C-alpha cells in the first residue's frame, strides 16, 4: 500500500509524468478499472509462472525459457492473488459508497521485473482514492476495517484449499530435479549453503495449517520452496499485506481503526510511538561498532554509520515539527542500537522493513486527519476492532522473507 502511495505521489500528484496522468484521466472510471485489472492480471501471471518454475520468460543464458503452457499455469498464482486483492479493495469501496463518500474504483498497479531477471510478484498492489473526507470515527472504522477482514477471509479459504491439496513430492522434483536423489529428506542436504535463495517466513496461520490440517507432513514444502506452490505463495502474500495494512500507524487501515476506537489524542501518541519502534526494529543490528585505534575498516564503517543515521532521520523526520527534535530522536535510536550491537552483536531486526518505514514516514504520514463528528464506537464495532487485532497477530511475521 505504501508503494502505491509513492507511485501516486510521484507520477500523479507531482506531475513527473503529466501526459500519462492526463491520458489515464480521460478514460472512463469503469474502463480504467478493467484496463488496469487486465494488465495487472497478466503481469502477476508472468511473475507467478517465474516463481513456480524458477525460470524466466527471457533467455539470460541459464535455465529454461518459459512458454505458453507456463503462462496458463501462472494463472494458479495470479487469479487467487488478484482475487484477494480485489476483495480487500472492494471492502473499502463498498463501505465508502455506503457513507456517500466520493471514492474511485480500485486502481491496480502492474509491476513485472522478469525482463531484467529480478523477482517480483507482478504488481505493487491496488488502492482506492477517497476524494472527500469521511465525517465520523464510525465511518473511518467501517471503511478501514472492511478491507483487511475481507482479504483475510479470502486468504484463509485459499490456504485451506492449498494445504489440503498439496501435490506429491514429484511436483517439487520437476522444479528441482537435483533434489530427487534425496527423496523426502532433500531438505537435510540441499540447504547447507542456501546463498541467495529466498526463504518465506512463518506466521500463526501457516503454523496452524501445517500442524493441524495437513495429514501427510512429508508433503509440506520447505520454506525455501513455498514460492513454487502458487496457492500457498499467494496466500502467504495476502496475509503479509493484511498484516501491513493492519499496523496501527498513521492512515493505514490499522491506523484508521486505532483512531476510530480511541480518538485523535490517543492516536497522536500511540501511532508515532509504534512507528519509532518499527523503525528501531527495522534497523536493529545495522550500526557498525568501531575501534578507532585498531579498526582497519574505519572509513568504511564511518560511512556506513552515517548512511544508517541518514536513513533513520529521513524516516522519522515528520514525527516532530522541529527538525532538531527529529535529529535528537534519530541519534537516540542510533545510539541505543549501537550500544546493543556492542554488547549483543547477534541481536538483529529485519532490514526489509526499512523501505516500508521510509515510505510510511515520508509519504503516508503517521498522523490522522480530524473528523467533524467525534463520538465513539458501538460495542459491536469495539468487538470487531479486537477481532482485527487478533487477525493482525495471526498474520504478522517479524521476518517475512529471508
Task: Give the location of each predicted region.
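Hydrophobic transmembrane alpha-helices and their immediate loop junctions
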Residues: 1-402
Amino acid at each position: 500500500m505504501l508503494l502505491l502511495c509513492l507511485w501516486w505521489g510521484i507520477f500523479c500528484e507531482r506531475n513527473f509524468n503529466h501526459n500519462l496522468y492526463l491520458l489515464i484521466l480521460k478514460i472512463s472510471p469503469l474502463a480504467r478499472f478493467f484496463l488496469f485489472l487486465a494488465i495487472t492480471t497478466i503481469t502477476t501471471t508472468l511473475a507467478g509462472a517465474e516463481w513456480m518454475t524458477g525460470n524466466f520468460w527471457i533467455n539470460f543464458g541459464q535455465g529454461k525459457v518459459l512458454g505458453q503452457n507456463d503462462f496458463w499455469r501462472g494463472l494458479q498464482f495470479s487469479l487467487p492473488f488478484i482475487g484477494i486483492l480485489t476483495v480487500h479493495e472492494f471492502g473499502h469501496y463498498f463501505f465508502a459508497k455506503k457513507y456517500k463518500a466520493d471514492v474511485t474504483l480500485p486502481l491496480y498497479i502492474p509491476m513485472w521485473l522478469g525482463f531484467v531477471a529480478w523477482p517480483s510478484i507482478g504488481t505493487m498492489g491496488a488502492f482506492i482514492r477517497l476524494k472527500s473526507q469521511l465525517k465520523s470515527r464510525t465511518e473511518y472504522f467501517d471503511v478501514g476495517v472492511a478491507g483487511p477482514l475481507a482479504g483475510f477471509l479470502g486468504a484463509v479459504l485459499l490456504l485451506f484449499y492449498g494445504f489440503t491439496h498439496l501435490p506429491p513430492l514429484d511436483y517439487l522434483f520437476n522444479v528441482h530435479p537435483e533434489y530427487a536423489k534425496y527423496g523426502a529428506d532433500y531438505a537435510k542436504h540441499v540447504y547447507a549453503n542456501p546463498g541467495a535463495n529466498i526463504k518465506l517466513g512463518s506466521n500463526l496461520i501457516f503454523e496452524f495449517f501445517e500442524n493441524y490440517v495437513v495429514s501427510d507432513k512429508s508433503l509440506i514444502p520447505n520454506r525455501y520452496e513455498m514460492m513454487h506452490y502458487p496457492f500457498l505463495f499467494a496466500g502467504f502474500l495476502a496475509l503479509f499485506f493484511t498484516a501491513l495494512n493492519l499496523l496501527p500507524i498513521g492512515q493505514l487501515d490499522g491506523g484508521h481503526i486505532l483512531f476510530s476506537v480511541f480518538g485523535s489524542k490517543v492516536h497522536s501518541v500511540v501511532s508515532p510511538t509504534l512507528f519509532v519502534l518499527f523503525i528501531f526494529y527495522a534497523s536493529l543490528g545495522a550500526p557498525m561498532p568501531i575501534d578507532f585505534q585498531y579498526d582497519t575498516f574505519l572509513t568504511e564503517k564511518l560511512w556506513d554509520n552515517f548512511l544508517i543515521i541518514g536513513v533513520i532521520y529521513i524516516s522519522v523526520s515528520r514525527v516532530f515539527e522541529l527538525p532538531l527534535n527529529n535529529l535528537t530522536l534519530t541519534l537516540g535510536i542510533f545510539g541505543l542500537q549501537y550500544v546493543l550491537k556492542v554488547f549483543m552483536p547477534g541481536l538483529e531486526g529485519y532490514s526489509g522493513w526499512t523501505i516500508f518505514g521510509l515510505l510510511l514516514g515520508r509519504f503516508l504520514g503517521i498522523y490522522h486527519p480530524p473528523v467533524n463528528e467525534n463520538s465513539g464506537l458501538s460495542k459491536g464495532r469495539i468487538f470487531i476492532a479486537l477481532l482485527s487485532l487478533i487477525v493482525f497477530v495471526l498474520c504478522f511475521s517479524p521476518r517475512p522473507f529471508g
